[in-house]
């Protein structure tokens, strides 16, 4: 249902009564409420997660049955079963419809009509769909399975029954109809009476009911039984149906139609207004098309709720008038439970916002109940009466809520922010976590894993310490059990306990809280006898099996038989007193820190240390050595100790006393094994004359560490002692102070007054007592801030008295005192009279105590607080000295240098130096006539690390609170009063030269901060800041500003600011800084950092812009830099300064000449005018302030405003983007203004005023991501009207700042225009109904061409138009370009500016749309774009040839004839191809008979192409006349492969008269011979093992392989067949001969009728020349002639033929013919191109194929 509480109850009761009343049944409201309350008790999940559907309702029934079994039937209300059964019958109707529909599909329409005539005519006006039963027994599992089966199996997916099944179904239907016809009337009456006459005090079924129930249940598994609808009572008062049909459709749509006829409008929507006008609209519910709902559900399931298509379907649904109930039903039916919860939440939030926004406009006519469908509008019948405005708001909110659903896979960071608070109990945190997780995902293994992971990750630090050991193995119950009493004391105590038991911390936690595989205590209890887990002491077998014998005579008293440890005697048997009995730590019950009940160490006591424990103290000579080769002597602890991280450094006694052996000194170092257990030993030096006890300084490196008595913890290394003649402070060290040589400190004597000290904790000052006896700092309860968290501890304060109820800070605090700071974790004691500073903080601030007594119990030396009056030490990149020789100086400058050095020596700023560093110095003369000393420190600056700027900007006096008194002081010679660190002085040495080298150079080095050192400003700022820190802490309510050597003091009271001045001067003098008393300014008319403070107004000091020296780029750059510096005080917009900024464009040379333009002169005059009136105000902290965005020309301007301007904020002149919309400039100003407000006042402005209307602002938030980002985290208000002040009225005269001419959707009556442009500079504008406009400019880029085309459209068409382009760049310009500022740096600035002006001149709107190019789709838009695109192409013939060759790799002749290029160009293309020249072959000259026309003689063979794998056997057939080739790749070369190849060849090439092959077995087989005989094809074979007879096909093999290699290198082919087909295509249809004919043309084209040439030829057999005869064909190496007296042609080598030229002389006789000389060398060396086909030579692949030189026939 999704609703709980009283609303859920009202909703359920209303729905229940309505459903039952529609069936003629009535139930009292009290009975319905009682049933609902019982329902919540049985099924608490139902109000929130359940719904009125069959699945949930049956789950309720099962839980009712389970509840009755556990609590008895008397615990169930009497009316529960009847109500549940009736409601289940209603919900089951849909199942019956599905079943009936499935059965009806197998029955013919005539048979179904005949079989159901009686049933349908019985009550034609009361047709409803019923249920299968009404008894409680139908809740059983079998019925559930049947119902689920019916729902899970859609009837559309059932197969149609065959004819026999159809007959069976007809028989079944007839049989059932007959049965139902007889009992229907009786069943109807019985069904109604059963509910109306129900005895509410008796829920037992009557015998008749049980019989009927058993009969119905028996039919559930009967194949012959078909459940038909049960007729129900219909309320006669319902209005008649609007439409009547003879037979309603079967299925869900039919059920809805039937329900509407009966007046049931629960599932009928949307609302349709039937009136003709708004006044007489009558709302009527109409059905939403079921197809639409199915489409929506399918889209959500397949593509997600936020997919574009899904949102389109939602918009289609939203086009109807839907009520809140309709939307909830639609969302619940189509969305997942998690998405539905998100949608419902968002819908409620949007509805609340709508009510708030429209409260004033509609005067409360729209309530939240209307929008949510709650309260009096809970029922659908009441929602139908809602007005159109309300329904529109409902639809708007529903769609917005739908769009807010995140896409699949996008996880919100809700769970990441759900963390346990410091004071929150762990179980409360887990409860919140489970609630959040279960809302996002259903319960199950996945949610449990997520909860467990987050229960660890998001827990606080204390709980994580307890969970960490069992994180992987523990359960959630283990986590909760461990964190029940989580506190720092518990964690520390467990660490102590683990250490005392010798266990790991993780093991101890697992034993205590569980976490193993077995849950809590999976390892079992721990035995106190043997220490093992799994049993207790009484069950210990080791104890029982190892009982020691009875004790003998006591060795202590010698008087009785008992153990020594149990001896209680005070005197021995002789009466002598006995020493006290030593008590082991194990038996001690009063354990304190430092006494650990540790288990016994390996060996006896003292054995591990090697010392005799009965004879302390020890000397150095008693210490043991680990091995003969050990370098150190072992030091052991002589007491049990437990250390924690908070204890810091502790001293461990060793009972070993000095002195060391003569001539040695000692070095104490730790043992490596100690580091493994977390014990860190601090190294120490033992002086040779030290006589006291040697102690070891240790500290814990992890939670807790235990040190057992006798355990070796350190080594003492004895080293040779070299005594030097250094000064001696004391004669002998003796036993005083453990450590090395003493220090010299300032001494403060102890007086009667308490030693109190101020220390800051987290920025808050505390006054406390220095207590050397306090281990830890303790804060008095009265001093502790109430809002600082603390937690109680189990420890108590022990001293002279005891303090209980000790608390401790829940978080570490940062302390600070002067220049020292650190972290402490103090205790908080309510009863302390004042705060105690313990040793944990005194040792950090260097507090020491000096005493002459050698018997101090504390080995400490405590003295006064150290001071440091040096600047911080500089960090250097290298220690390599830098030496630059001093250059010579003139006499005047040399004398000035010597005088200045003398003065600085007297002032203590310089000292003599022997430094290896040296850099030059020089002097300059100031205007006053005085000289100034400077040092060239560039080389030194390069060797130091940059310390950075501590104050990146100037402080503004605007932030000084309004009305406060102000004093400004200035420090005199600040750099020279700050001392350099002694280690750095040597690096700033210099030399004073001597003329003519009369004396050695005098060398000096600076002791103070030198001018020219890059880190001097930073060091100065840090030093002064430390000096005034005490004044800041003392006067925290004052306002103190420090920048370099200027300090501003402010306070509301004049007397207090004077007091601050006195304290400030004292603090500065204490650090050696001097205040210039003559420069102290007080109260009013003050000058500070270039500004003038007069009252509450701040102005810039008077300036005058000079124009007489503005000549170069550098001059103008400085001028504009100064103007920008003072612009925060000036009302100067960027548009007003634009003429000045434009002067900077052009040559980047700094000395390039620039001139003032008239516009720039006006801008400078405006600057001077604004300087004279520039004023800003100081801030009033008690009032809010605003950030106002002002709409000014070119770019917007902003100001911080509080009844006046606090500061002006401007944007740069040039934007980094080419096109920046005006609204984006506004977001940049918002970000910059908020940042500036936080810089000045540490707070966001209270209001932001934007130059847009509310509607425009909302649209910008939705459409532009920059706006939400600019307002991220802003908690104030956004306003849309500027303050009414004359200062801001200039912004009212402004240009367009919001696009209004660009339409976001296509215009209905707009002219259609297509534009395109290409990189060749051609732009095309195709206006529908006109001739295309083509413009060419070879200088244009593709972007420029695209923009030119768009500009042409704007120039040609003034009406509304829809422009389409395939350029993303062009569509991206709109609508921003309408209000954008254009950057002049772009090359297309002129075109963009022209386009912008055309837009501003337009009177009609336009639309710019993007369309994908080269899609080949049908339709006018795609075709129009394709047409425009085709007009932009200008491909040269050479480019086309290159593209074609890159694809096909054809020969040069084909390129020449196809693209009409020269022979040289074609050859050059082939030559430059990286794949073609590699495959040239030299032809073999010879004669090979071939056909004289196509399809006469073929040659066939098989070649192997290994790259084809299993298809490597390539069968090749070539026509010897046309050279037309066909090949197939096959898996073998057997007879079947040859037959299949021949069949395909015939289909591809026709069939020949003769085929020539070699003597391969497949070719000479009987099958081949029979096959060729049937086709009447002659078959001949060549000479065995002589391939020359097959020369043509062999050459074809090479051609095919060469073409395959070319294509394979140039492209990607998926199969061998694909590659082979492309190669055949090139050889047959692309390559050409010298006459421009392809092989296909020669093979299929007509044979030329041109006359054959006559030649003379030599008969090789007769050795004589004959002729003239007809030359049939000729080629490289061969010729075919047809003698006039012969019957067949004769083939001869081509060198034995001569062209016949008809002469007057007679034909030469044979004798003379023999003497005819052979062709000259020139003929013999003719180019192959002159004799062979181009497709065989020009690409380097010459073959033996020839060309019919005259007729164009084959070769």
Swiss-Prot record:
Known catalytic reactions: DNA(n) + a 2'-deoxyribonucleoside 5'-triphosphate = DNA(n+1) + diphosphate; Endonucleolytic cleavage to 5'-phosphomonoester; dUTP + H2O = dUMP + diphosphate + H(+)
Pfam families from the UniProt entry: dUTPase, Gag_p10, Gag_p24, Gag_p24_C, IN_DBD_C, Integrase_Zn, RNase_H, rve
Ranges of residues in domain RNase H type-1: 1307-1437
Binding-site residues, Mg(2+) 2: 1316, 1346, 1366, 1429
DNA-binding region: 1653-1702
Chain segments carrying region Disordered: 154-193, 572-631, 1699-1755
InterPro entries: Aspartic_peptidase_AS, B_retro_matrix, B_retro_matrix_sf, DNA/RNA_pol_sf, dUTPase-like, dUTPase-like_sf, dUTPase_trimeric, Gag_p24_C
Zinc finger (CCHC-type): 525-542, 552-569
Residues involved in Zn(2+) binding: 1445, 1449, 1473, 1476
Sequence positions that bind Mg(2+) 3: 1501, 1558, 1594
Co-factor remark: The RT polymerase active site binds 2 magnesium ions.
Residues involved in Mg(2+) 1 binding: 970, 1045-1046
Residue span, Integrase catalytic domain: 1490-1647
Keywords: Aspartyl protease, Capsid protein, DNA integration, DNA recombination, DNA-binding, DNA-directed DNA polymerase, Endonuclease, Hydrolase, Lipoprotein, Magnesium, Metal-binding, Multifunctional enzyme, Myristate, Nuclease, Nucleotide-binding, Nucleotidyltransferase, Phosphoprotein, Protease, Repeat, RNA-binding, RNA-directed DNA polymerase, Transferase, Viral genome integration, Viral matrix protein, Viral nucleoprotein, Virion, Virus entry into host cell, Zinc, Zinc-finger
Enzyme Commission number, as recorded: 3.6.1.23, 3.4.23.-, 2.7.7.49, 2.7.7.7
Active site: 771 (protease)
Site entry: Cleavage: 99-100, 195-196, 228-229, 254-255, 269-270, 496-497, 745-746, 1437-1438
Positions with biased composition (Basic and acidic residues): 154-169, 178-193, 1716-1740
CC annotations in GO: viral nucleocapsid
PANTHER family with a match to the protein in the record: ENDOGENOUS RETROVIRUS GROUP K MEMBER POL PROTEIN, RNA-DIRECTED DNA POLYMERASE-RELATED
Name the UniProt record assigns to this protein: Gag-Pro-Pol polyprotein
Species, as recorded: Mouse mammary tumor virus (strain C3H)
């Amino acid at each position: 249902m999704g609703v709980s509480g009283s609303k859920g109850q009202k909703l359920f009761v209303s729905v229940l009564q309505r459903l039952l009343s529609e069936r003629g049944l009535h139930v009292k409201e009290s009975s319905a409420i009682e049933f609902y309350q019982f329902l919540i008790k049985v099924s608490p999940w139902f109000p929130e997660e359940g719904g009125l559907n069959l699945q949930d309702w049956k789950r309720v029934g099962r839980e009712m049955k389970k509840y009755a079994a556990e609590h008895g039937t008397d615990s169930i209300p009497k009316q529960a079963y009847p109500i549940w059964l009736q409601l289940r019958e209603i919900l089951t109707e849909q199942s019956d419809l599905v079943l009936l529909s499935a059965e009806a599909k197998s029955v013919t329409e005539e048979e179904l009509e005949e079989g159901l005539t009686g049933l349908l005519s019985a009550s034609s006006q009361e047709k409803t769909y019923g249920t299968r039963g009404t008894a409680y027994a139908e809740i059983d599992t079998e019925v559930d399975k049947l119902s689920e089966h019916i729902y899970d199996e859609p009837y559309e997916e059932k197969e149609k029954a065959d004819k026999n099944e159809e007959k069976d179904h007809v028989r079944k239907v007839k049989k059932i109809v007959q049965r139902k016809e007889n009992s229907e009337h009786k069943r109807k009456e019985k069904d109604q009476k059963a509910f109306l006459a129900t005895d509410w005090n008796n829920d037992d079924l009557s015998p008749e009911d049980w019989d009927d129930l058993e009969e119905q249940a028996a039919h559930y598994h009967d194949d012959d039984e078909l459940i038909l609808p049960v007729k129900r009572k219909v309320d006669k008062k319902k209005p008649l149906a609007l439409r009547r049909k003879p037979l309603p459709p079967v299925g869900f749509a039919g059920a809805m139609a039937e329900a509407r006829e009966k007046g049931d409008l629960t599932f009928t929507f949307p609302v349709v207004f039937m009136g003709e006008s708004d006044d007489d609209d009558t709302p009527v519910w109409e059905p939403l098309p079921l197809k639409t709902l199915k489409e929506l559900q399918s889209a959500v399931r397949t593509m997600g709720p936020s997919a574009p298509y899904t949102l389109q379907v939602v918009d289609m649904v939203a086009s109807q008038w839907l009520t809140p109930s309709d939307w909830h039903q639609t969302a619940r039916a189509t969305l997942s439970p998690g998405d539905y919860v998100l949608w419902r939440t968002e819908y409620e939030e949007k509805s609340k916002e709508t009510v708030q926004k429209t409260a004033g406009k509609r005067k409360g006519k729209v309530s939240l109940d209307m929008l949510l469908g709650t309260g009096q509008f809970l029922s659908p019948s009441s929602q139908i009466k809602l007005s159109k405005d309300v329904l529109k708001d409902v639809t708007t909110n529903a769609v917005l809520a739908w769009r807010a659903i995140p896409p699949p896979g996008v996880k919100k960071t809700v769970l990441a922010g759900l963390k346990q608070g410091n004071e929150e109990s762990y179980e409360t945190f887990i409860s919140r976590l489970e609630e959040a997780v279960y809302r996002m995902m259903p319960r199950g293994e996945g949610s449990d894993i997520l909860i467990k992971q987050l229960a660890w990750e998001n827990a606080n630090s204390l709980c994580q310490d307890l969970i960490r050991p069992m994180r992987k193995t523990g359960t959630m119950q283990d986590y909760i059990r461990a964190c029940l009493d989580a506190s720092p004391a518990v964690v520390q105590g467990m660490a102590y306990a683990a250490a005392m038991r010798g266990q790991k911390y993780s093991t101890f936690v697992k034993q205590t809280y569980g976490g193993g595989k077995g849950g809590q205590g999976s390892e079992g209890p721990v035995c106190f006898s043997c220490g093992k887990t799994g049993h207790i002491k009484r069950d210990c077998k080791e104890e029982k099996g190892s009982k020691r014998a009875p004790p003998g005579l006591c060795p202590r008293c010698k008087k009785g038989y008992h153990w020594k440890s149990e001896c209680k005697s005070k005197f021995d048997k002789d009466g002598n007193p006995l020493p006290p009995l030593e008590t082991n730590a194990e038996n001690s019950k009063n354990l304190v820190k430092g006494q650990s009940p540790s288990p016994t160490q390996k060996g006896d006591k003292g054995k591990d240390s090697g010392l005799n424990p009965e004879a302390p103290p020890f000397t150095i000579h008693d210490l043991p050595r680990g091995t003969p080769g050990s370098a150190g002597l072992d030091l052991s602890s002589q007491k049990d100790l437990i250390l924690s991280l908070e204890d810091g450094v502790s001293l461990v006694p060793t009972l070993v006393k000095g002195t060391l052996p003569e001539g040695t000194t000692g070095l104490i170092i730790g043992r490596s094994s100690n580091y493994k257990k977390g014990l860190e030993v601090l190294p120490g030096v033992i002086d040779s004359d030290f006589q006291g006890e040697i102690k070891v300084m240790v500290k814990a490196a992890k939670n807790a560490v235990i040190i057992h008595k006798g355990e070796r913890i350190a080594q003492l290394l004895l080293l040779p002692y070299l005594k030097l003649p250094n000064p001696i402070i004391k004669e002998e060290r003796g036993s005083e102070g453990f450590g090395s040589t003493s220090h010299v400190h300032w001494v403060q004597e102890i007086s009667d007054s308490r030693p109190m000290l101020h220390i800051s904790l987290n920025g808050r000052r505390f006054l406390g007592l220095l207590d050397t006896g306090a281990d830890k700092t303790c804060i008095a309860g009265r001093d502790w801030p109430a809002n600082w968290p603390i937690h109680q501890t189990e420890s108590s304060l022990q001293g002279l008295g005891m303090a209980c109820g000790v608390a401790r800070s829940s978080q570490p605090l940062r302390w600070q005192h002067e220049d020292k700071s650190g972290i402490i974790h103090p205790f908080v004691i309510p009863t302390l009279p004042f705060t105690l500073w313990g040793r944990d903080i005194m040792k950090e601030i260097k507090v020491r105590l000096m005493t002459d007594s050698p018997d101090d119990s504390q080995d400490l030396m405590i003295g006064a607080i150290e001071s440091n009056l040096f600047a911080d030490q500089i960090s250097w990149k290298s220690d390599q000295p830098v030496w630059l020789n001093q250059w010579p100086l003139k006499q005047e400058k040399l004398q000035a240098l010597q005088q200045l050095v003398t003065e600085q020596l007297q002032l203590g700023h310089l000292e003599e130096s022997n430094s290896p560093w040296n850099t030059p110095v020089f002097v300059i003369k100031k205007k006053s006539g005085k000289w100034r000393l400077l040092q060239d420190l560039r080389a030194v600056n390069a060797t130091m690390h940059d310390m950075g700027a501590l104050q990146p900007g100037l402080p503004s006096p605007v932030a000084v609170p309004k009305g406060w008194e102000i004093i400004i002081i200035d420090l005199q010679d600040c750099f020279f009063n700050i001392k350099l660190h002694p280690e750095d002085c040597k690096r700033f040495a210099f030399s004073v030269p001597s003329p003519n080298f009369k004396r050695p150079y005098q060398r000096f080095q600076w002791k103070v901060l030198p001018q020219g050192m890059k880190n001097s400003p930073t060091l100065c700022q840090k030093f002064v800041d430390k000096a005034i820190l005490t004044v800041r802490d003392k006067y925290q309510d004052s306002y103190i500003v420090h920048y370099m050597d200027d300090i501003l003091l402010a306070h509301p009271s004049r007397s207090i600011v004077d007091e601050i001045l006195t304290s400030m001067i004292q603090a500065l003098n204490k650090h050696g800084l001097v205040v210039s008393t003559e420069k102290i300014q007080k109260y009013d008319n003050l000058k500070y950092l270039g500004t003038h403070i007069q009252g509450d107004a701040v102005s810039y000091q008077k300036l005058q812009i000079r124009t007489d020296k503005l000549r170069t780029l550098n001059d103008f750059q400085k001028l504009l830099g100064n103007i920008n510096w003072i612009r925060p005080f000036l009302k100067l917009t960027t548009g007003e300064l634009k003429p000045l900024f434009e002067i900077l464009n052009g040559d980047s040379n700094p000395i390039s000449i620039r001139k003032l333009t008239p516009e720039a002169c006006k801008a400078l005059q405006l600057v001077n005018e604004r300087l004279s009136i520039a004023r800003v105000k100081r801030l009033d902290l008690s009032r809010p302030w605003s950030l106002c965005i002002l709409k000014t020309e070119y770019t917007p301007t902003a100001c911080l405003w509080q009844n006046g301007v606090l500061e002006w904020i401007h944007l740069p002149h040039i934007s980094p983007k080419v096109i920046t919309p005006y609204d984006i400039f506004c977001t940049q100003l918002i970000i910059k203004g908020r940042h500036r407000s936080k810089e000045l006042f540490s707070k966001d402005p209270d209001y932001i005023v934007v130059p847009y209307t509310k509607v425009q602002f909302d649209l910008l938030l939705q459409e532009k991501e920059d706006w939400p980002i600019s307002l991220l985290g802003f908690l104030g208000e956004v306003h849309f009207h500027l303050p009414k002040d004359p200062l801001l009225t200039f912004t009212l005269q402004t240009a367009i700042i919001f696009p209004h001419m660009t339409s976001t959707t296509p215009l209905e009556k707009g002219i259609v225009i297509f534009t395109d442009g290409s990189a060749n500079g051609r732009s095309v504008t195709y206006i529908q109904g006109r001739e295309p406009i083509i413009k060419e400019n070879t200088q244009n880029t593709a972007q420029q061409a695209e923009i030119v085309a768009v500009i042409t459209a704007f120039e040609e068409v003034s009406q509304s138009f829809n422009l389409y382009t395939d350029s993303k760049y062009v569509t991206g310009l709109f609508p921003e370009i309408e209000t954008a500022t254009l950057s002049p740096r772009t090359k297309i600035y002129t075109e963009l500016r022209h386009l912008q002006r055309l837009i501003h001149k337009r009177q009609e709107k336009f639309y710019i749309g993007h369309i994908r190019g080269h899609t080949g789709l049908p339709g006018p838009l795609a075709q129009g774009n394709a047409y425009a695109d085709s007009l932009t192409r200008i491909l040269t013939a050479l480019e086309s040839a290159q593209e074609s060759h890159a694809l096909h790799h054809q020969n040069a002749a084909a390129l020449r004839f196809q693209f009409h290029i020269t022979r040289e160009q074609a050859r050059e293309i082939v030559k430059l191809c990286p794949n073609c020249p590699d495959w040239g072959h030299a032809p073999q000259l010879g004669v090979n008979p071939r056909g004289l026309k196509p399809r006469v003689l073929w040659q066939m063979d098989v070649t192997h192409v290994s790259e084809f794998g299993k298809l490597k056997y390539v069968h090749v057939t070539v026509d010897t006349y046309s050279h037309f080739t066909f090949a197939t790749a096959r898996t073998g070369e057997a007879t079947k492969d040859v037959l299949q190849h021949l069949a395909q060849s015939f289909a591809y090439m026709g069939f020949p008269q003769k085929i020539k092959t070699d003597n391969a077995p497949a070719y000479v087989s009987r099958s081949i011979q029979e096959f060729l005989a049937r086709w009447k094809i002659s078959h001949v074979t060549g000479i065995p093992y002589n391939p020359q007879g097959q020369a043509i096909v062999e050459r074809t093999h090479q051609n095919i392989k060469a073409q395959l290699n070319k294509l394979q290198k140039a492209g990607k082919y998926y199969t061998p067949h694909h590659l082979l087909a492309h190669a055949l295509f090139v050889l047959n249809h692309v390559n050409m001969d010298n006459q421009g004919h392809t092989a296909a043309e020669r093979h299929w084209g007509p044979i030329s009728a041109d006359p054959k040439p006559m030649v003379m030829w030599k008969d090789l057999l007769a050795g004589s020349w004959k002729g003239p005869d007809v030359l049939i064909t000729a080629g490289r190496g061969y010729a075919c002639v047809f003698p006039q007296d012969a019957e067949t042609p004769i083939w001869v080598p081509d060198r034995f033929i001569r062209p016949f030229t008809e002469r007057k002389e007679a034909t030469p006789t044979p004798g003379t013919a023999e003497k005819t000389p052979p062709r000259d060398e020139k003929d013999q060396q003719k180019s192959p191109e002159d004799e062979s086909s181009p497709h065989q030579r020009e690409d380097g692949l010459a073959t033996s194929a020839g060309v019919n030189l005259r007729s164009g026939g084959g070769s």
